[in-house]
Amino acid sequence: MRNVLRLLFLTAFVAIGSLAAVLGVDYGQQNIKAIVVSPQAPLELVLTPEAKRKEISGLSIKRLPGYGKDDPNGIERIYGSAVGSLATRFPQNTLLHLKPLLGKSLEDETTVTLYSKQHPGLEMVSTNRSTIAFLVDNVEYPLEELVAMNVQEIANRANSLLKDRDARTEDFVNKMSFTIPDFFDQHQRKALLDASSITTGIEETYLVSEGMSVAVNFVLKQRQFPPGEQQHYIVYDMGSGSIKASMFSILQPEDTTQPVTIEFEGYGYNPHLGGAKFTMDIGSLIENKFLETHPAIRTDELHANPKALAKINQAAEKAKLILSANSEASINIESLINDIDFRTSITRQEFEEFIADSLLDIVKPINDAVTKQFGGYGTNLPEINGVILAGGSSRIPIVQDQLIKLVSEEKVLRNVNADESAVNGVVMRGIKLSNSFKTKPLNVVDRSVNTYSFKLSNESELYDVFTRGSAYPNKTSILTNTTDSIPNNFTIDLFENGKLFETITVNSGAIKNSYSSDKCSSGVAYNITFDLSSDRLFSIQEVNCICQSENDIGNSKQIKNKGSRLAFTSEDVEIKRLSPSERSRLHEHIKLLDKQDKERFQFQENLNVLESNLYDARNLLMDDEVMQNGPKSQVEELSEMVKVYLDWLEDASFDTDPEDIVSRIREIGILKKKIELYMDSAKEPLNSQQFKGMLEEGHKLLQAIETHKNTVEEFLSQFETEFADTIDNVREEFKKIKQPAYVSKALSTWEETLTSFKNSISEIEKFLAKNLFGEDLREHLFEIKLQFDMYRTKLEEKLRLIKSGDESRLNEIKKLHLRNFRLQKRKEEKLKRKLEQEKSRNNNETESTVINSADDKTTIVNDKTTESNPSSEEDILHDEL
């Protein structure tokens, strides 16, 4: 499926912006999936550090040993599969499945109680905004910050992926789109947007309906629909925390060059029934069996032990997955409580009997979506073309059985990847909403599942602005009833499904004098502009005061309107959003933790490299051949180094200077390499004959360097002669030509390398002159050869770059000559044309004079005058007289 989408994307891919990438995130309660799209990575799934396709939703926060309780450097965050195992050992530090708590307060007993049961041991507190925070090791973490940490870690991996694709790329994630349930209210939506706003690098965030994400993916994958025939599908999405049934119509116009239209038609949901509920049911079965087997353990005692409950929940989750494919699951929990190991089994039949009361609830959202369609839609269940399965829990056998009973087996569509359809769809919608790239066009009609209303402070009646089923994004203006007086301030309350969530205070006092009853004889009204954004946030964009006055003109009356825009402020009711200062503080805190995590990871990685190198070095030293024939001084030095550094490793802590570790890695590596090279050279004679050969090679290389210098000098001298008319100073132009950065960097140490090479040649000459050869000097001779080989290799590489660079610069001089030569030619030709034009103009003037003279002669002859060449106008007049 993903290959099909990638093909569609590639064929339509056109970058609108640059250096940007879109990250689509399917933010689930239990798992998170992400896809990044950029010019370097069309539809690339962001894998976890363990190369898995989905990420555990949550993280663990621990305090490192050796740090004070208030030391900000002592915090370690763990993500990925390791978090699952930490939940049973450190339940009070493991923060999982946070999605249902977004935009909630501790007053929401149903949500909070259910979460506490699923995640025992965590301490929840209320913030000053009435939202939920977790207290971990006496540090308070607002829910938005925890979600942002999770998202930031994924965005960082996406950026690393782009860098791995092309090290030269400057693409980075700056836009993000999230899946979100349609039943999420204003507070929940704002909380998710706030979480995204405190991440680093994310400039724009978009919220996309989970159902619409799957529908978009389905259309792009299906590709072909009967032209002119409207089809109806239901996306049945059963995830970990909820069930959603989204009804859509899909229409391919008869003109198949026109885009497909996807329209949201109906919705049903259950916010608490999902995979997590089934996990808790299996956990209850395990708990009951344990208490029956161990009557000495009381229920209260078991429930007071967070680790025991976490182990039961973990075993229940594994059993649920096994029962999806098998009829029985074995349970094995070590040291459940009081060092008691517990073993039992759960059958699928036991599980299905236990949840029998929930069976009707499984399909109720589908019935609700059909019976509560928006507007005038009236599609019946038998007319549905198919039910598209999404969400991991839709694979549970009892769930599929209920769906088949409701709509028949052939209408249950399994050709969509239940795990990844939403993330594929949300990234495509994110691309469209952000206008980042051009893709296959789709007409998407999204509708609100809630009704949005307002109430003025002096009235009791609610006025609907956007009713259930209204398409969005949408904007509308409403003119209020006329009033005779203007208060200093008045309020507008905003409601979602009749529940107050925000109060707008309008400052009208500033215009009271301008809108008095004398000036507005017909009264004053307010024109309020409401907006339902693409994120389905309901807000007021503008409030205008309208003055209505009556002017008598004869027997008729003309109404004259004039308006002023009023300032207003907004305040969340009950649950409040993060303030700008809180956003800034949390953003900086996450940046600090990211920096510390990166440094800690690099530190630990370097420690591991050092430890590995030390053990490799020790193994080398224990080799019989090295012990007998190795370079004794270097073997002794490395042996002592290994012993000292291994002892040093025992005491290394995060306070250790990272440079010390890198320095030790380098020292071990250099010495180990020398010994290995020495052993590899065991068959080399290292005698005078070999050194004479080395000396000859060295002189040849120095001669090659000198020859190249002379060649360049000859060319420059030749150019000075040949290009004297076009280039004033050839040598100066040659020096001015810049070489590539990598060449300049490599040649910055040319003189140093050349000097070291000459010194090694001098050392060879000294040994040859004194005939210092023999087994007792073998180590020293090898060291000389090693130095010679190293500097020769470096010098040869640098000479190659010099030759290439000089050749390029000489070619540039030739090009400069040609450019200047052509420029001179153009100037000469231009001057020549100018001279020719002037000459031509002069010739024309001469010819004109001759013609005029001939005319004069004719006139004179006709007048019978003898003067053939009058010298002045005065003479001509005189003759005429």
Swiss-Prot record:
One cellular component (GO) term of this entry: endoplasmic reticulum
Keyword presence, Zinc: no
Domain of life: Eukaryota
EC number: 3.6.1.-
Class of this enzyme: hydrolase
InterPro entries (alphabetical): ATPase_NBD, Heat_shock_70_CS, HSP70_C_sf, Hsp_70_fam
Annotated stretches, region: Disordered: 833-881
Posttranslational modification: N-glycosylated.
Protein name as catalogued: Heat shock protein 70 homolog LHS1
Species assigned in the record: Saccharomyces cerevisiae (strain ATCC 204508 / S288c) (Baker's yeast)
Gene name, Swiss-Prot/TrEMBL: LHS1
